Structure formats: structure tokens, C-alpha cells
């Protein structure tokens, strides 16, 4: 598992300090963007079949619970910047779970784009090119581990 530079860690921690205190609204921004990029992803959430609109789904208790879980994964990654390998088993399992429910690995890129969008919207002028790159570096480490778990789960099913 790759490591982040000390500068990347500093930028990520500094930006997450304010965002991490109010996770759900930021997560809703992220998922709103995700569903703009790929509306089909909404169908992977089985509890969204009764929603009249994307916004209705995003405000449902079940979906807000999922948003909270995703934001807690980001929070865990930020909390473990000095020891990302300690999250490897967790991230491998998360990749397996996403493969099992039908998420394809291309969607991971859209989630990354949505994360960056949320950061840009939330941080405003504090969102700089070095900060964007730091988050991209972290996200690529997370996705690499999740993708390994995703692929491993697919291999297990093929056997």
C-alpha cells in the first residue's frame, strides 16, 4: 500500500477538520453529484424504488444511513493517514461488498470525482490544486485496496 507525503497528510487533515464535524450534509452533496454523473447508480440502492425523485431518495432515512457510513470510511482514512495499511483488510472487504451488490469498478472513479466536487463546494477558496492532488492521492490508495477486494470477490464467485 502506498504512502502519502507529509504535505498531503497535512492538507487532508486541515481540510477534513471542518468537514468531518458535519459529515451528512457534505455526504449528501457528494451523492447528489454522483447521481448527476451516473443516475443508474441510484438503482443499486434497493430502498430507493419508492422514491419520487433523487432528492427524495437522498433524504430518506435509509439513504442517509448509507451516506453516514461512507463519510465514516473517509473519516477513518483521514484518521489513519499515518498507518493506512491498518485499513487494508477493511477496504478489501468493502470492495468485496461493493462487488456483491453490483457496483462496478468504473463507479469508483465517479465516486472520486464526486468527492472532489464536494470538497470544492464545501471548501471554496481553500480548495487548491495541491489540496485536490492530496485527496486524489488518498482516494487512489483507498480505491486500489477496494478494487483488489472487488476483484478477489469476483474470482471467488467464478470458482
Curated annotation (Swiss-Prot):
One of its GO terms (cellular component) is cytosol. Residues 3-151 form the Globin domain. It catalyses: Fe(III)-heme b-[protein] + nitric oxide + H2O = Fe(II)-heme b-[protein] + nitrite + 2 H(+). Its EC number is 1.7.-.-. The keyword rRNA-binding does not apply. Its main location: cytoplasm. Heme b binds at residues 66, 98. Keywords: Cytoplasm, Heme, Iron, Metal-binding, Mitochondrion, Oxidoreductase. Pfam families: Globin (PF00042). The keyword Metal-binding applies. It is found in: Cytoplasm, Cytosol; Mitochondrion matrix. GO terms for biological process: cellular response to hypoxia. Belongs to the globin family. PANTHER family: BLR2807 PROTEIN, NEUROGLOBIN. Monomeric globin with a bis-histidyl six-coordinate heme-iron atom through which it can bind dioxygen, carbon monoxide and nitric oxide. Could help transport oxygen and increase its availability to the metabolically active neuronal tissues, though its low quantity in tissues as well as its high affinity for dioxygen, which may limit its oxygen-releasing ability, argue against it. The ferrous/deoxygenated form exhibits a nitrite reductase activity and it could produce nitric oxide which in turn inhibits cellular respiration in response to hypoxia. This is Neuroglobin. It comes from Chaenocephalus aceratus. The gene is ngb.
Amino acid at each position: 500500500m502506498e504512502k502519502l507525503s507529509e504535505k498531503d497528510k497535512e492538507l487532508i487533515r486541515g481540510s477534513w477538520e471542518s468537514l468531518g464535524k458535519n459529515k451528512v450534509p457534505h455526504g449528501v452533496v457528494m451523492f447528489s453529484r454522483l447521481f448527476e454523473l451516473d443516475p443508474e447508480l441510484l438503482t443499486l440502492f434497493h430502498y430507493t424504488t419508492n422514491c419520487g425523485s433523487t432528492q427524495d431518495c437522498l433524504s430518506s432515512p435509509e439513504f442517509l444511513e448509507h451516506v453516514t457510513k461512507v463519510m465514516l470510511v473517509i473519516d477513518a482514512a483521514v484518521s489513519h493517514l499515518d498507518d493506512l495499511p491498518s485499513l487494508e483488510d477493511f477496504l478489501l472487504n468493502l470492495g468485496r461488498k461493493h462487488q456483491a451488490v453490483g457496483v462496478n469498478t468504473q463507479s469508483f472513479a465517479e465516486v472520486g470525482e464526486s468527492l472532489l466536487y464536494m470538497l470544492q463546494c464545501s471548501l471554496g477558496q481553500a480548495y487548491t490544486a495541491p489540496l485536490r492532488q492530496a485527496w486524489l492521492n488518498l482516494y487512489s490508495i483507498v480505491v486500489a485496496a477496494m478494487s483488489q477486494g472487488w476483484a478477489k470477490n469476483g474470482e471467488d464467485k467464478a470458482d
